[in-house]
Amino acid sequence: MSCSDSPSGNSFLVDSLIHGRSEGSGHYYQNSGVYLQPTSEYSYGLSNCGYFSGLKRNESNSQNVVPTCGPYQGMETWLETSRSCRIEQPNSQITPRSFSPTIKEENSYCLYESEKCPKETITEDISYSRLTPNSCPSSNNNGCVPVPGYFRLSQTCTTSKGFTDNQTIPTHVVAQRSTRFDSSLSAIAAEASRDESDEPPTCAPCAPGRNKELRGSTGTASSPEPPDSPEKAVTVTKAGDSKSESTANWLTAKSGRKKRCPYTKHQTLELEKEFLFNMYLTRERRLEISRSVHLTDRQVKIWFQNRRMKLKKMSRENRIRELSANFSFS
């Protein structure tokens, strides 16, 4: 601050700091040689500065007073060198450091490796002139990346190494995984084709046990002699399967529709005899009949239920017929 020690200058400083912005045009003080700009021109005036504590007008030792709050660092780049009361503009050269000159200082702080940073393109950033003298362009985009001086060089080096490792290693890993995946797919496809070619021709599914019982009850032909060649065996098994499907599929006819009467004449005759003897069967008797007729327990049970419903329907019709015969409707 290039201000004189006269009491008038000190009183000007105290008044300007305490009252903040002054209204009207700029003021010029002859004793101190300071020109103050009006606050309408600059929005950032002196209202943001801190107040001096314990300062009076007529004190001559006001230079030893320390402000309560520190100056704002960003104000240095806004001010001009023409004003004598402002803080001087820092030079573009490197400012002297507080540490001893024996410590070696790096010329530049770079986020990336030194190989990727050509020295020809190093430029100077104005906004970070006090913090970093030089900046280094990144490898991905041509713009400059300013690094503040409070970053340690060891931290930036470690981050740059980790960044390069993360960028290079996953490419090899992905390539190896993709090649292994493709090779495994091709091997699986080859094994599947081999299995399909080596599989023997499968025969049709065998008929269930109840179908065999029905064939035995209907008196089908006995099993033929074992054939000599495998081709004959295949033809015989296919013919037997077709016969068993046609004769033993007791719920569906050849055309695919549901059969009206899935039981054979022999089975129906045996069940009618038992029904005339007893309409309701016990479990033991039902098991005996199912063995004799080559049917399951459930089939015999369903047949007796249907037969009882049929008898009930017939008796109802006969009763209605008898009642209608007595009355003549003319």
From Swiss-Prot:
GO terms for biological process: regulation of transcription by RNA polymerase II. Keywords: Developmental protein, DNA-binding, Homeobox, Nucleus, Transcription, Transcription regulation. Residues 256-315 bind DNA. The keyword Transcription applies. SMART domains: HOX. GO terms for cellular component: nucleus. Residues 190-249 are annotated as: Disordered. Gene3D superfamilies: Homeodomain-like (1.10.10.60). SUPFAM superfamilies: Homeodomain-like. It is found in: Nucleus. InterPro entries: HD, HD_metazoa, Homeobox_CS, Homeodomain-like_sf, HXA10/ABDB-like. Its main location: nucleus. PANTHER family: HOMEOBOX PROTEIN ABDOMINAL-B (PTHR45874), HOMEOBOX PROTEIN HOX-A10 (PTHR45874:SF1). Sequence-specific transcription factor which is part of a developmental regulatory system that provides cells with specific positional identities on the anterior-posterior axis. This is Homeobox protein Hox-A10b. It comes from Danio rerio (Zebrafish).
